[in-house]
Swiss-Prot record:
Belongs to the cytidylate kinase family. Type 1 subfamily. This is Cytidylate kinase. GO terms for biological process: nucleobase-containing small molecule interconversion; pyrimidine nucleotide metabolic process. It comes from Clostridioides difficile (strain 630) (Peptoclostridium difficile). Pfam families: Cytidylate_kin. The lineage of its organism: Bacteria, Bacillati, Bacillota, Clostridia, Peptostreptococcales.
């Protein structure tokens, strides 16, 4: 059997990363968090004092960044940045970086190279619709903004961030708007993707639903 490619798409907070990680372990295949790649570029921009709305400078940062995945870690220029890319500041700015066409093209190139070498499950916004339109399996996870906001809020509180549920939900809705309306490779459900509403479901229930659809 050749390499297996599984695409998991959906808006912020729908549970893509959590579900994809567990499915990857169950199927013993590699997991690629494509959103983390855009977060890495965003983090580097913020760390370098670059305005994320300055497309030219953001593209330069992306071109000069070495992003890699190994043993469930994401590396930026040879350093592990798992926690650094999960801050509120990065979350609030990542959609502005991810909407830049040239940045997406650079990241997609890396994603496709990884997918050609190994069996993978990738999660993101445009995996099934653009990065791997011929993926073997495509899933599109959704949930209400309130449910997604609640999940993100709990996650941030556990990390010690001082924010409100209202602010988190507002940010989720704002990111949906940017992701869905960007010109290049927007957040969209592929025609042949299976939509799963994760609202009110446990992680185990969603994982079981995904795994049950995959024939190895």
């Amino acid at each position: 059997m050749g390499n297996l490619v599984i695409a998991v798409d959906g808006p912020a907070g729908a549970g893509k990363s959590t579900i994809a990680k567990i499915v990857a372990k169950k199927l013993n295949i590699n997991y690629i968090d494509t959103g983390a790649m855009y977060r890495a570029v965003t983090y580097k921009c913020l760390k370098s004092g670059i305005d994320v709305n300055n497309e030219k400078e953001v593209i330069q940062i992306a071109e000069n960044s070495d992003i890699d995945f190994k043993d469930n870690n994401i590396y930026l220029d040879k350093e592990v940045i798992n926690e650094e890319i999960r801050t509120i500041e990065v979350s609030n700015n990542v959609s502005n970086v991810a909407k830049i066409k040239e940045v997406r093209q650079l990241m997609v190139e890396v994603q496709r190279k990884i997918g050609m070498k190994n069996s993978v499950i990738l999660d993101g916004r445009d995996i099934g619709s653009y990065v791997f339109p011929d993926a073997d399996y495509k899933f599109f996870l959704v949930a209400t903004p309130e449910e997604r906001g609640n999940r993100r809020y709990k996650e941030l509180c556990n990390k010690g961030y001082n924010t409100t549920l209202e602010e988190v939900i507002e940010d989720i809705i704002r990111r949906d708007e940017i992701d869905s309306n960007r010109e290049f490779a927007p957040l969209v459900k592929a025609n042949d993707a299976l939509e799963i509403d994760t609202t009110g479901k446990t992680i185990e229930e969603v994982v079981e639903e995904v795994v049950s659809k995959i024939n190895l």
